Structure formats: structure tokens, C-alpha cells
Amino acid sequence: MIKKYFFSFFAFLFLLVGCSNEEVNIVKKHEVIEIGIVGEIPSLIKENNIKFKKIMLQDLHKKNEDPFDAIMITKDYLQEASDKQYTQFYLNSSIPIVFVQSDKAISAFIIPNHTYENTFENQAQDYFIGYYQGTTFGVALNGNTNEDLIKGYWSLFDLLDRLKQTNN
């Protein structure tokens, strides 16, 4: 009898949570993560511990990246970001470089003479791909809803937070 009530309670709870129309609110506890971003700041990320600061692609190799925990380059700037003048910056950066919504593989950005046009497709179809001190990484989305996008950003922020902790 107790098992029946126990099962019914959890089935009801599961249905109640599954049918919610509430806005996704994923609360994570991170230290402050500061990201230099080339492109638009994501409007879905509103937490106070995630700080974005707009930067210009042309200024990447002129700037000291120390104030940032990572640099993000959004889809509209990927073709230009694959120019060989930036390759050494990505390879030598002391912080992770993240490319958002790239249709191409990471090699477009980190291998000299590869460009966005002549590099093969991103077969993994990761939403975020990146490079950090000899390591490439990717974060995929589980779907194409705002909730999936927010969860993808949080997976990326978790990764960046771990990299930050490892580097300190």
C-alpha cells in the first residue's frame, strides 16, 4: 500500500514538473566569469556572476586578455576570425577561445592557411567549439529550444569555470 502511494506521489510530481510553462531558471554557483565577446551579448544569460564585455576582433592581438576568463566569437564574425592573422593569438592565448555556432571545424581557426571557406564541416555539430592551451573542446545542445540553449551555455560556463580553477 505504501509503495502504491509512494509511486503515485512521484508520478504526480513528475507530471507536475514536466508540464510547467515557467521560464527556465537554472541557478549555478560559480565564481564570477568574465568573458570578452566579439559580437552580440547573449540575451538569455542574465545571471550576475556571468559578465560579458564587447571587444573588437581587430583588437584581439593588441589586448591583454588577463581581465577575461575566456573570449567568445559569435557566428557573424567567424569567417573573419579564421583569418591567419589571428591564428597565433588563438594558439598562444592564456585563456580559452570559444567559437559560437561554427559550421566548420576548429582547424579553421588554429591551423595556418586554413580558412572558414576551405575547412571541413563541424561533424560533431557542437554549438560551442573552442581551443585552450593545446586542447580543443566542444559543447553540443540537446535540442533547439531556449531551454536547451541556456543549458548549453551553462555547460560551457561549467567548463570555463573548471578551466579557470585548474589554471589558478
Stretch-by-stretch model annotation:
Residues 1-5:
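Positively charged n-region of N-terminal signal peptides that target proteins for export
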Residues 15-18:
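C-terminal motif of bacterial Sec signal peptides marking the signal peptidase cleavage site
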Residues 37-67:
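A short, well-structured beta->alpha microelement
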Residues 37-38, 71-75, 98-101:
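Conserved beta-strand segments of the P-loop GTPase G domain that flank and frequently precede/overlap
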